[in-house]
């Protein structure tokens, strides 16, 4: 029989760093989703109002200058917890809080330092405001805005979020992407399956024009075999385009930006998941 090499300390550190790299990529991607930052700031406001424990939100902070032998951020990436599972965790936390008494008591010993948290959340809030104002003034594509977004991601990456908080932010972004996909599937089904527009023609017209109606108006008037059918489906297609426009308004992101954030988030999740699988397999050999 062959022998299986056991995981060395160096190998364990390498896997841990790859897990952390994947999670950092997810967290940096999520930082570009405005709702993620506002949600986290709202959670901290609840802590200050004594509605939450600080340890319900974060486990601590990462010093960007001290990354050696750093343990991976706690997260359920790889276990695919859904909203129902996260809700169950919330209920368990509430029960624990009732048993423990005052929600502010657990932050004194071993939990996050409240003073450091106040400073870090203040920094996050300030940078979020700088980024928001730059987007309003210059647009997301502007050089100054891109620099502000990068700085916001750097600040956000320093937060060690509790698993349920991290995963809720990821799930929120995933659900937003699913809303986009639902409307895109509706539009494609109407155009390709029912109106018989060639899929290649549809993809060329629709891609990067998801919230525009010009491509649709052109195809209706193009005198093609599918044009009369598109006219008949005008109301349904316009409704779906309107819902995509609503998503852009809600998020402050274009559909293309939502897709790009989701793509980078998915790549980071895959990296972390692969490294976690390696860690589990290595531990099973022991």
Predicted features by range, described:
Residues 1-286:
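Transcription initiation cofactors for RNA polymerase, centered on bacterial
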């Amino acid at each position: 029989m062959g022998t299986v090499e056991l995981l060395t300390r160096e190998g364990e550190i390498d896997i841990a760093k790859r897990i952390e790299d994947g999670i950092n990529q997810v967290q940096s991607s999520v930082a570009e989703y405005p709702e993620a930052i506002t949600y986290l700031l709202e959670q901290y406001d609840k802590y200050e109002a004594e509605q939450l424990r600080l340890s319900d939100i974060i486990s601590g902070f990462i010093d960007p200058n001290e990354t050696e032998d750093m343990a991976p951020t706690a997260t359920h990436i790889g276990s695919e917890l859904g909203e129902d599972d996260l809700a169950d965790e919330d209920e368990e936390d509430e029960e624990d809080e009732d048993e423990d008494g005052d929600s502010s008591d657990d932050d004194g010993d071993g939990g996050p330092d409240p003073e450091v948290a106040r400073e870090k959340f203040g920094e996050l809030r300030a940078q979020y405001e700088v980024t928001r104002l730059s987007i309003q003034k210059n647009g997301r594509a502007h050089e100054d805005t891109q620099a502000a977004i990068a700085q916001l991601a750097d600040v956000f990456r320093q937060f060690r979020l509790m698993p349920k908080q991290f995963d809720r932010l990821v799930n929120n972004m995933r659900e937003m992407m699913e809303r986009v996909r639902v409307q895109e599937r509706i539009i494609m089904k109407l155009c390709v399956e029912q109106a018989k527009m060639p899929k290649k023609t549809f993809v060329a017209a629709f891609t990067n024009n998801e919230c525009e109606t010009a491509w649709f108006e052109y195809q209706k008037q193009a005198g093609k075999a599918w044009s009369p059918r598109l006219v008949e489906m005008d109301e349904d297609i316009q409704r779906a385009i309107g819902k995509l426009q609503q998503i852009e308004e809600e998020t402050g992101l274009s559909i293309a930006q939502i897709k790009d954030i989701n793509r980078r988030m998915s790549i980071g999740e895959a990296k972390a998941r692969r490294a976690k699988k390696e860690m589990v397999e290595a531990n099973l050999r022991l």
